[in-house]
Amino acid sequence: MEKMHITNQEHDAFVKSHPNGDLLQLTKWAETKKLTGWYARRIAVGRDGEVQGVAQLLFKKVPKLPYTLCYISRGFVVDYSNKEALNALLDSAKEIAKAEKAYAIKIDPDVEVDKGTDALQNLKALGFKHKGFKEGLSKDYIQPRMTMITPIDKNDDELLNSFERRNRSKVRLALKRGTTVERSDREGLKTFAELMKITGERDGFLTRDISYFENIYDALHEDGDAELFLVKLDPKENIAKVNQELNELHAEIAKWQQKMETSEKQAKKAQNMINDAQNKIAKNEDLKRDLEALEKEHPEGIYLSGALLMFAGSKSYYLYGASSNEFRDFLPNHHMQYTMMKYAREHGATTYDFGGTDNDPDKDSEHYGLWAFKKVWGTYLSEKIGEFDYVLNQPLYQLIEQVKPRLTKAKIKISRKLKRK
């Protein structure tokens, strides 16, 4: 096994074709990390000109110290049962990490627990410290240890039927409601950033500046690995649909009124049907007024939601999503998710990753809502083998990875106690 010098294109081709490859190991992903102070080095190993393993090493300087952290996000990309290739990758990583004064090499392979026995054993044998099997969104990890994934290598009906029953009904309703899902361009990021700000204010989290999303789009879109989707509501088109539905409801009422006059047996049923239709008419009249007001203010329509869809070979990722507070009954997110899954499948993906989650958290958990949303899309829990550290500077590692977090937790506890007094 020997070190190899390969191009960025060869590196990406290997990552995209390998079962353990991941978006975070693509060379263009490293470009997106520059804004936050990371820089990259890449390594490859193989035999007789054939690549057998690669890794993208991200480095970031430790504040106020002449040291760095080496982070191989979702790497190494290698067959973990191939001890020779794994050992060669570690040797190459150590050589570069030491030159960059890294205190540790941190990895979190895209390898699931039920397939990771070799990986776990072989990494430990090489001297890696395993950080345990904690909850998926544990703050002790950089990347989530658990994600929710939908298999999308099936036709439209099979895909829809893989969703939970209630969610399936919502998707069907969303398709009828009259929104349009657009694959947008870079200009659409302005709208997306505005929707993200609204989402952050509603759900209570800090949002990224538009430059962050532009950075991702610019780096990965050219290779087809980043797409922006937006969902639009056209008031004129939907006013016409509401008028049609109102006409149908009035016709239905007339039909049941006639039955009431001709059949006493059906009188009770007819009255129930009339009441139901009248309730629907009231709701549609309210909706029509809202749409007419929207048409006056925004005759061209408004965007209700958006998302970034990412790719790495046969894997697709729902990376960021945002939505408006208006017209939520139109279920724009449901329309968008189903459309993005189909788009991903049509462009070679077999899986659709919803991102991080815990495993069946309690209802009072801060992560319950996230899990509840992701579980209804025909997903399975992808539990990874977790995070590993290869220590290069033990005193500094202990200070940064162990002592400092304890001090931070202690400060938080003291602060909370003082606030209670």
Curated annotation (Swiss-Prot):
Residues in the signal sequence: none
InterPro entries reported in the protein's UniProt record: Acyl_CoA_acyltransferase, FEMABX, PG_Glycine_Bridge_Synth
Principal subcellular localisation of the protein: cytoplasm
GO MF annotation, one: aminoacyltransferase activity
Domain of life: Bacteria
Enzyme class: transferase
A Pfam family hit: FemAB
Keywords: Acyltransferase, Antibiotic resistance, Cell shape, Cell wall biogenesis/degradation, Cytoplasm, Peptidoglycan synthesis, Transferase
GO biological process: cell wall organization; peptidoglycan biosynthetic process; regulation of cell shape; response to antibiotic
Subcellular localization, as worded in the UniProt entry: Cytoplasm
Gene3D superfamilies hit by this protein: 1.20.58.90, 3.40.630.30
Cellular-component GO terms for this entry: cytoplasm
EC code: 2.3.2.16
Catalytic activity, as annotated: beta-D-GlcNAc-(1->4)-Mur2Ac(oyl-L-Ala-D-isoglutaminyl-L-Lys-D-Ala-D-Ala)-di-trans,octa-cis-undecaprenyl diphosphate + glycyl-tRNA(Gly) = beta-D-GlcNAc-(1->4)-Mur2Ac(oyl-L-Ala-D-isoglutaminyl-L-Lys-(N(6)-Gly)-D-Ala-D-Ala)-di-trans,octa-cis-undecaprenyl diphosphate + tRNA(Gly) + H(+)
PANTHER family: LIPID II:GLYCINE GLYCYLTRANSFERASE
Function as written in the Swiss-Prot or TrEMBL entry: Catalyzes the incorporation of the first glycine of the pentaglycine interpeptide bridge, which is characteristic of the S.aureus peptidoglycan. This glycine is added to the epsilon-amino group of the L-lysine of the membrane-bound lipid II intermediate (GlcNAc-(beta-1,4)-N-acetylmuramic acid(-L-Ala-D-iGln-L-Lys-D-Ala-D-Ala)-pyrophosphoryl-undecaprenol), using glycyl-tRNA(Gly) as donor, in a ribosome-independent mechanism. Involved in methicillin resistance.
UniProt subunit comment: Monomer.
Family, as annotated: Belongs to the FemABX family.
Protein name in the entry: Lipid II:glycine glycyltransferase
Organism: Staphylococcus aureus (strain MW2)
Lineage: Bacteria, Bacillati, Bacillota, Bacilli, Bacillales
